[in-house]
């Protein structure tokens, strides 16, 4: 098993938390994990991305070469476009279709989505809307949408959420699990 995943978005969207959950689930299965993350501006709105490599064999480097990512998981559509050079020819993009407009010259969202829809494997939906319906965060909804492409049993993702968020209380754990379940059904 080998998965190279680029997670991207903007500061405050919970991309680092999603990477932590996937890493924890993979480690619980005895898989090897390498991760590299870059935090943009320390305030909400700066670009954030993480390279996450998972495999049954040892992993030498934590950075995914361009053209080799199996998945790009993005909390923001323009950020998904920014990291497309990393996507393999048969890779999947899973992205929130709702933009985070934090710059004056943000491109027309219809143009951004049209570019993403040209990809052979793209799941794009309004994760913010799904999250509101279950009173949760969109990052967890996106994790649920990506679950079918991770080659990690869904139960292991739920168990990782329980381990990671249990100190925040049962309500937070239940909210996050409800969100990944809603994301798995969304598309």
Locations of regions flagged by a protein language model:
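Active-site cofactor/cluster-binding pocket
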Residues: 1-187
